[in-house]
């Protein structure tokens, strides 16, 4: 179920925030098990809160999980939800696309998040319709964080909860980018290009 918020914005400037949980990081051996979305305007105001879907995976897939996600998903309760889920990969992708059709234009909105390139690799392989719906560009908050760590080593980064659940991770990514925007980026009214 999605939640809609009203703000003044241009639909072609919207950002699709995505976070995925995977059974590991090797896209050739592992798979998606959770995906959540939020659509914001260009000012990072929430336009709509999308679905947060746990995707069922069979025993043989879960038996092949990498150690870190196996341990983490047992601790945070995601493992039980994966086993109990009735969503197939196709069901999840279709629900995500249906949500995005209401709140973004195909091919216009970039996807955003922390280490979003990794999510994008899995999306490209397992949810190709979603990959095609989003603009080819990505907004990777972890890239900005890496630059801030190097250029402003004394900067106090926002604390994260690290629940390793997709929706929580998106909310933290949006808050993190808002923090960098307010405290690191210089406000300008003129373009230097």
Swiss-Prot record:
SUPFAM superfamilies: Ribonuclease H-like
InterPro entries (alphabetical): Exonuclease_RNaseT/DNA_pol3 (IPR013520), Oligoribonuclease (IPR022894), RNaseH-like_sf (IPR012337), RNaseH_sf (IPR036397)
UniProt keyword list: Exonuclease, Hydrolase, Nuclease
Gene3D superfamilies, sorted: Ribonuclease H-like superfamily/Ribonuclease H (3.30.420.10)
Gene Ontology molecular function: any one: 3'-5'-RNA exonuclease activity
Domain Exonuclease: 15-177
Residue positions of the active site: 136
Assigned EC number: 3.1.15.-
Family label: Belongs to the oligoribonuclease family.
Job of this protein: 3'-to-5' exoribonuclease specific for small oligoribonucleotides.
Descriptive protein name: Probable oligoribonuclease
